[in-house]
Amino acid sequence: MQKQVTPRGRPLGATTFEVEPALAFGAVVRALRTADGVGQEALAYQAGIERSHMGKIERGEHMPTLAMILRIANALGRSAGELLLETESVLSEQQNARRQSQATDS
């Protein structure tokens, strides 16, 4: 009897986080940063994060940890709660737009 080999790791293209919240959080961070006239590198430095990592966060390619969210919020001069409320607002708007689109398609 042959032993069945199970592939290790996650499937190609799979992520360990939900993409929509990551995209929304990144969009909020980018919008606040640009509204404040702060460059990505400056924000990353103030938050103690590599610039390339900050870019991944803003593009929704990485979901930051709670500690990182707190540092980003502090660097933006805002609370983590404000960032998360804005993120929830973006997600809600996207969900409403999808519902309206589906309703008009029917």
Q: What does each model-found stretch correspond to?
A:
Residues 1-31, 35-36, 41, 74, ...:
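N-terminal flexible/basic segments that precede or flank functional cores
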Residues 27, 31, 45, 56, ...:
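DNA-binding alpha-helical recognition surfaces that contact promoter or target DNA
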Residues 28, 39, 65-68, 79:
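Residues that mark the N-terminal boundary/hinge immediately upstream of a DNA-recognition element
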Residues 37-56:
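Short alpha-helical DNA-recognition segment
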Residues 68-73, 83-84:
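Hydrophobic micro-packing sites on short alpha-helices
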Residues 77-93:
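Short C-terminal boundary/hinge segments that cap the last helix of small helical domains
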